[in-house]
Amino acid sequence: MKRKALALLVAATLWTSPGVVGQTPNSAAPRHITLHEAVELALKHNHDVRLAGFSVDEKQHAKEAEKSSYFPSIHNDSNLARLTDTQLIQINAGSLGTVNGAPFPAESSILNQGGRTLTASGTQITQPLTSLLKIRRANDIAEAEVKASRSKAQLTTNDVALAVHEVYYAVLIAQAHHSATEARIQAAQDIESERVQQVKFGASLEQESIESRANSLQAQQELLTTDLQLTDLQLKLNDLTGLPLNTALDLDPSVGEVQESCPREECVVTAKNSHPEIQAARAEVEKAVAAVRLAKTDIWVPDVDAFGRYSYQNNVPFLARNFGTFGIHLSYDLFDAGHKHAVLHERESQLSEAKENLAKVSDEVELQVQTAYNKLERTQQMLKVSEEILALRHESNRVQQQELLRGAALKSQAATASAQEFEAKALLLQSQLDYARAHDEFVRAMGATPE
């Protein structure tokens, strides 16, 4: 079943309707927009889509930050200090022996150990060794978070696109109902006029005249309700697409084609393999697995780093002004009151939770696909029924118009038949768009973006 082939019927149904959403007599020219353009605008300007994109960027930068831990780090440590006092060293005369029979030193001396103002500066390069194992696990966690954020962003994109489709269809349906209601009002007014004349000549009861008046007012009330609904839908569509809320829109009734769906079981398998929600859940499992490995590594593997340092000092005793230092640094917690093991148990619980959530999401996706598939089949059947109803209403209206020309039918009867045909057209349009909407929901359930 193709939507494009139904565009003429949509246009014919809407020709007497408002057509332009949100337009007032003094408003600017409406903006013509197609369904595809509305979806593109929403994906470009919608706040939820933009927020999801920023979340992906955030996780990507977090991954880059974790990756940088693989490489050596260089940092400088400098100090300027003022001492209140220093230790003095006294060397007595002759304490160092004699030189050519004379005591050395010849007299006692008092030496100061350095100055009271100290300057020290060191630049050190550090390369993690055993910590690389922990860094790898941290990078696995960051990579899983990136995957999850991308899947969630895709899910947000699918939801926003589906919402645009639903509101777009709702506007077209409301416009069709607007036309049908106007036709009903005209028919009710004709009946009311005839009843008034019949009451004057005694051919009808006054109660029938009152009833026809009530029907006319009820139709006008429905028209006002439809107008209010159109206004609300226009605001919602503008909000979804990122347009100013007061933008008047002229919606293109041609909404593309419905593609043939895959067999039911094949659809379920495809959805489980590619649905963004399942992919996000799988990424959470990968993240939890990496977190468990990191916790185990943190328990058993000490932190070993290789470092090299170049230092400069002034007034620090017993050190050269410039010197280098090279070595290995090892750090290991001998006792932490069970903290690391508790963290490991926490990560294992999170892993179990992530696996259970994956199973839950998989079941939910299968349910969504089955439900959407059933709805697609039902709406297709409803579409066929609506087509038959329209054919009968069209034939009835044709007969009534011919009888009106021959004088065998009243004007109100012909107007009622026309109104019923308009209602049948609106019903068919609603069935068509319900079928299209069901297909879009099916596409979303499969994990794809409705176009």
Set out the residue ranges of the language-model regions.
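N-terminal signal peptide c-region/cleavage motif recognized by signal peptidases
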Residues: T16-S17
